[in-house]
């Protein structure tokens, strides 16, 4: 029995990067032998075990065969006679198909096992598929795109790009389950340059299948005086990259991605203006979130940003009453943390424009000041003072907030 570290751990070590993931393959062992060494079985489809001390995952070397379309259509074979190379050949990219032996004390020993040229592709900065089995799992298209967001200087090898396009044309992407699509998109959004993920998906045709709402934004013009980059799709990519550069959360990055969906449905005769695109964005965003089963915290923030980002940009022109109405519509008084994220997304929107990446965004500070003032109003005391007139409470609280905001930010009420 031999144990090997495989995949990302070897790749990242060769690149001089911190090792994020540690995956292990065990060659020449049976499930019974693993259990005898106190490894705990956890795999459903094939034998995966947790180490008794570190709780890291160890999988028996296996081969796999495609039996049906989509992500789940595989049959696995595992036995002591499955070799390391047979296990590595089923992996997606050459840079992920390398291994090193692990000694009994956990140290990596011996040379890098690299049967498919992964080290050469690392040096060439190429994503290249290992073999013909790549076409058997459509998730690999999403994984390549996600790796492009992490390793932004890497390119997809021409033969791999052609294979990905063929898979999309064959309908393989259409068989993906929504949860897995969201999982890969979310991970890609959290990488250093998420725009690269969408570029790779667009180049192979997958973006039009899994996120047609985003694909439709490319080529849609905007007013050049507001958006020097002109193309709406380019703008959205700049926005998500700015959000990534700032280290913003996944909900903020998803809101940044989806804030302008409605611009794709602007009537051609009014372009490049996009009057009312905020409402159309909301109408497109709701079914998108339902289709991909987007988590509530991502969906709810994205809806606020899609609906209100135009108003957030215009707050320097607003009086106190309009500011308070905006805070109330965005539910900022009850959910200040979410509103803070909405400000991050709107700031990314403002700075995700060609040549305006560092432009000041005083709107955020004004809204923060307004929210502090509005939340300081003692609604309970006002309600107590109007105990016999409950119909007047809501309006009285609103007027008190308007006065507080007017004083705090120095604008007329």
Swiss-Prot record:
Residues engaged in binding CTP: 8, 11, 91, 143, 146
Catalyses which reaction(s): a tRNA precursor + 2 CTP + ATP = a tRNA with a 3' CCA end + 3 diphosphate; a tRNA with a 3' CCA end + 2 CTP + ATP = a tRNA with a 3' CCACCA end + 3 diphosphate
Enzyme Commission number(s): 2.7.7.72, 3.1.3.-, 3.1.4.-
A molecular-function term among this protein's GO annotations: CCA tRNA nucleotidyltransferase activity
Gene Ontology terms: biological process: RNA repair; tRNA 3'-terminal CCA addition
Domain HD: residue ranges: 232-333
InterPro entries per UniProt: CCA_bact, HD_domain, NT_sf, PolA_pol_head_dom, PolyA_RNA-bd, tRNA_CCA-adding_enzyme
Cofactor: Mg(2+); Ni(2+)
NCBIfam families according to UniProt: PRK10885.1
Described function: Catalyzes the addition and repair of the essential 3'-terminal CCA sequence in tRNAs without using a nucleic acid template. Adds these three nucleotides in the order of C, C, and A to the tRNA nucleotide-73, using CTP and ATP as substrates and producing inorganic pyrophosphate. tRNA 3'-terminal CCA addition is required both for tRNA processing and repair. Also involved in tRNA surveillance by mediating tandem CCA addition to generate a CCACCA at the 3' terminus of unstable tRNAs. While stable tRNAs receive only 3'-terminal CCA, unstable tRNAs are marked with CCACCA and rapidly degraded.
Free-text comment on this protein's domains from its UniProt entry: Comprises two domains: an N-terminal domain containing the nucleotidyltransferase activity and a C-terminal HD domain associated with both phosphodiesterase and phosphatase activities.
The protein, known as: Multifunctional CCA protein
Organism of origin: Burkholderia mallei (strain ATCC 23344)
The encoding gene: cca
């Amino acid at each position: 029995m031999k144990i090997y570290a495989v995949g990302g751990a070897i790749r990242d070590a060769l690149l001089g990067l911190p090792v994020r993931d540690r995956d292990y393959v065990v060659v020449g062992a049976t499930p019974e032998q693993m259990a005898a060494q106190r490894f705990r079985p956890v795999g459903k489809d094939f034998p995966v075990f947790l180490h008794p001390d570190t709780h890291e995952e160890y999988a028996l070397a296996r081969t796999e065969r495609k039996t049906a379309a989509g992500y789940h259509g595989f049959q696995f074979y595992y036995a002591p006679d499955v070799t390391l190379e047979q296990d590595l050949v089923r992996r997606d990219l050459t840079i992920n198909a390398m291994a090193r032996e692990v000694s009994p004390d956990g140290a990596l020993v011996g040379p890098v096992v690299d049967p498919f040229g992964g080290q050469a592709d690392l040096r060439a900065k190429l994503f290249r598929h290992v073999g013909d089995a790549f076409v058997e799992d459509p998730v690999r298209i999403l994984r390549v795109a996600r790796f492009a967001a992490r390793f932004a200087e890497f390119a997809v090898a021409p033969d791999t790009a052609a294979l990905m396009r063929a898979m999309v044309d064959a309908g393989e992407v259409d068989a993906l389950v929504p949860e897995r699509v969201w999982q890969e998109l979310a991970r890609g959004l959290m990488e250093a340059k998420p725009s690269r993920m969408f570029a790779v998906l667009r180049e192979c045709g997958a973006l039009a299948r899994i996120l047609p709402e985003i694909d439709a934004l490319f080529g849609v013009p905007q007013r050049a005086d507001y958006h020097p980059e002109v193309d709406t799709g380019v703008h959205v990519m700049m926005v998500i990259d700015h959000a990534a550069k700032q280290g913003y959360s996944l909900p903020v990055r998803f809101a940044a991605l989806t804030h302008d969906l409605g611009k794709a449905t602007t009537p051609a005769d009014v372009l490049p203006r996009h009057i009312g695109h905020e409402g159309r964005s909301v109408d497109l965003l709701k079914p998108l979130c339902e289709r991909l089963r987007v988590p509530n915290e991502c969906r709810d923030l994205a809806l606020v940003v899609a609906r209100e980002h135009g108003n957030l940009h215009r707050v320097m022109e607003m009086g106190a009453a309009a500011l308070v109405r905006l805070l109330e519509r965005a539910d900022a008084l009850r959910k200040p943390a979410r509103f803070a994220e909405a400000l991050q997304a709107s700031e990314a929107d403002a700075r995700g424009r060609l040549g305006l990446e560092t432009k000041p965004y005083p709107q955020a500070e004004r809204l923060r000041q307004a929210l502090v003032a509005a939340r300081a109003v003692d609604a309970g005391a006002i309600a107590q003072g109007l105990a016999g007139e409950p119909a007047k409470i809501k309006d009285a609280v609103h007027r008190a907030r308007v006065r507080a905001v007017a004083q705090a930010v120095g604008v007329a009420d």
